[in-house]
Amino acid sequence: MQHDENTPTDGRKTEENAQNIQHVQSAAADGRPALYGRKVLSFVRRSARLDARLQRAWDTYADTYLLNINAGEGSLGVREGFVFDQAYIRETWGNTNPLIVEIGSGQGENVVAAAAARPDVNFLALEVYDPGVAHTLLLAGKQNLKNLRIAQINAPELFKAAVDGSIAEVWTFFPDPWPKMRHHKRRIVQPELAADIHRALTDEGVWRIATDIEDYALHVHEVMDELDGFHNDGALTVSLPVEHVGKGNADEAAALRHADFAESERFDGRVLTNFEKKGLAAGRVIHDFTYRRV
């Protein structure tokens, strides 16, 4: 999920609330369920019209790549009783190859490149935003990929539906940072999700995470480093402030007490997307994490 597009700011808060209200009203008028009620989500759902090219991609490729596991029209929840198990994986992908799940696949650049490079591995892209799903459909369809599927699903619900040992790897690259202190509970990396991912991973399976936000890197360490059942495989030593500073206060972090943390070399299975290029051009440091199930 590319956070430069999806992160709310103070100036957009009123507009965001209006859009959310409009979405609920629109869903009710169409007979569709309003999404999620009071659940804490890692994203803000905004309706976005597809341009002609993306609409054609959706119409052409959705039946091939988009999983039909949603609770209903317009819902990002998993339908009641759905189980993501080996039988479903075998039926959907047509084989029992290892499965890699990317949370927040954005425009699909990374997951499509990975699927094309590794035809003996199955891939599932999780993305909630219509344009991102449509663009991933377009890229996958152009290459006629057989080993990729897409689910427009709230990621934590998919992992709750997954059976033990069904997934080889999970990727979460550049998630929405939710920089305001009061929004940290919306960050996708949370203990509850980590527990579900741990259960769903195969033995020695890994969760790969990357962020270009220093404060989010600290958050990842706080959530993941002391969890039973995960080992931080990082071999690099990185110095980070040990306190959160919140949105707009990044300059204050340099004066805070720092500590050393273990992080990984850049994952060579991640393509250099336009989003990552922008972060590097802005002088941001990329933090990579590899947490292995033990």
UniProtKB/Swiss-Prot annotation:
From the record, give the transmembrane residue ranges. Answer: none
Per its record, the protein catalyses: guanosine(46) in tRNA + S-adenosyl-L-methionine = N(7)-methylguanosine(46) in tRNA + S-adenosyl-L-homocysteine
A single Pfam family it belongs to is: Methyltransf_4
Where substrate binds, per the record, is at: 180, 212, 273-276
Q: Could you state a single Gene Ontology molecular function term?
A: tRNA (guanine(46)-N7)-methyltransferase activity
Q: Which UniProt keywords apply?
A: Methyltransferase, S-adenosyl-L-methionine, Transferase, tRNA processing
The protein's annotated pathway: tRNA modification; N(7)-methylguanine-tRNA biosynthesis
Residues annotated as catalytic? 176
Q: Name one GO cellular component term.
A: tRNA methyltransferase complex
EC assignment: the record states 2.1.1.33
Task: Tell me the residue numbers annotated for binding S-adenosyl-L-methionine.
Answer: 102, 127, 154, 176
Coiled-coil regions listed in the entry: none
Q: Which NCBIfam families match?
A: tRNA (guanosine(46)-N7)-methyltransferase TrmB
Family the UniProt entry places it in: Belongs to the class I-like SAM-binding methyltransferase superfamily. TrmB family.
Please explain the role this protein plays, according to its UniProt record. Answer: Catalyzes the formation of N(7)-methylguanine at position 46 (m7G46) in tRNA.
What is the protein named? Answer: tRNA (guanine-N(7)-)-methyltransferase
Gene symbol here is: trmB
